[in-house]
Amino acid sequence: MSLGKAETLSLLERQQLIDRAVRGAVEHAYHHAPAVREKMDRVGVSPSDIQTARDLEKLPVTTKDELVSLQKANPPFGGFVTIPVSKLRKICTSPGPIFEPEAGDPLERAAVVVKGLAAAGFTAGDIIL
């Protein structure tokens, strides 16, 4: 598998790509996940305050205990899902219990893993344990 465009960017270009993705993800979460909006509003952080990956440290941390409480108060995801529940492919539960929604295409996730392995220098015939 050949490397994608992102894997061949300069460090500056890659950081700019990451920063754009971070801005987009935070903006989307703020406008579509009530729990994210509430947590950000509570600490006075708006999406415009998050311009780079380094700015993520401004966001409040959600502890496991807080997540469990939020999921009990607003089942099953505690206000953290940003897409319609009908678009979820599966829901995993972990001990705790914590519900983890999954929406993406498993083949797209596999392609990301393959690209990572290619970037690390693995090729056809290599054995990975």
Residue ranges and their predicted role:
Residues M1-G125:
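Nucleotide 5′-phosphate-binding alpha/beta core
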